[in-house]
Amino acid sequence: MTRDKYDFLVLLDSIQGIWYNTNLTRKGNIMKSFETLNPMQQQAVLHTEGPLLVLAGAGSGKTRALTHRVAYLIEEKNVSPWNILAITFTNKAAGEMRERVNGLIPQGADSVWVSTFHSLCVRILRRFIENLGYESSFSIYDTDDQKTLMKQIFKEREINGKLYKERGVLGIISSAKNELVTPEEFALESKKDGSARSQQIAELYKEYQVRLKKNNALDFDDLLVKTVELFESCPEVLDYYQERFRYIMVDEYQDTNTAQFRLVSLLASKYR
């Protein structure tokens, strides 16, 4: 990313943030809804500075507290919606959260970035993936695409289909990516292990990634892996999103894997 492009994006975001801050006309109304929360939920809402982990059982109102916290930040703390990121695990949950926030604060709520981990990463990568040697028009491979690609690799390498199954190999690769284990790291561990099977899978993992990049494609797990790689290799891009997302909330945080945890940690490391 060129410096001019970075400066332009920062300026654009600043202008939008100022616009929303000067158009919040319902400040104080959120407190009426706040009174319907139980004491523990209220504590979670009022804690606006520094890390906070909310642990509670299913159906206890964690998501409700999170959406009220978003509204409280905007209406009572005068935080720009532009600076708030709320992450969920499913598109359905993201849609429900948007509806809840809109119900609490119609003014400016649309500018709160509510999304799943993967949709967040897609938007970031569409903008900056050229820094990693991909084109911004990259394809996202679904399960069928992945299986077709792996079948091609199996055929060309004359892999015994009785000993190795495409679905099984892809599952192992997916698990490795979720733990941010690169093909090189996987190969190193397989050599230490001494297993011929693990070494074969390491070769398949390596070739699979080579083919994906050649096709200008990412699989679902790559969306997280490549966003983490982007942030770690391009400090100016990370800084841009750290400035953008000064308040980050993750629904069902206890379910995050290593890649998701690393992504959130990088984004939140500047403002804690």
Regions found by a protein language model. Give the residues of each.
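A basic/glycine-biased coupling hinge at the interface between accessory DNA-binding modules
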Residues: 3, 8, 14-28, 49-52, ...
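Short amphipathic alpha-helical boundary/capping segments
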Residues: 32-36, 57, 156, 160
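Conserved RecA-like helicase ATPase core segment
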Residues: 32-36, 52, 62, 72, ...
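N-terminal pre-P-loop "Q-motif" helix
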Residues: 34-48
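Walker A/P-loop
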Residues: 50-68
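SF2 helicase catalytic motif II
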Residues: 243-258
